[in-house]
Amino acid sequence: MVTEEDVRRVALSLPGSVERPYNRLPSFRVRSSLFLRIHELPDAFFVRSASVEERNELLRAEPGKFFITPHYEGYPGYLVRPSQVDLDEMTEIVTESWRLCAPKRLLAAYDAEHPPTW
């Protein structure tokens, strides 16, 4: 099971990532863009998606792992249940959310250090 500390460690390992409170809960930003926040619901954290359509596909494919509340209905983001993902999947999810918010120079530096393994 992934813990809040695991999520924090992965988020802060990404270039330019900073932790700031959001409604008294941890959130993580790159520049001024929020890419992850620990949610007030138990066993949930919020991440961004590329689009509402992409998010909806994830929700349909794996409703046990991913969900939204009415607040996120028209927003390109979703909630993840950390108890339902392993460390590798959580790392991939958090990194992808960061990639959607990071400036090009940080993406280039990150990609140079982490070339694709496919």
Predicted regions and their residues:
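Charge-dense, helix-prone N-terminal extensions
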Residues: 1-118
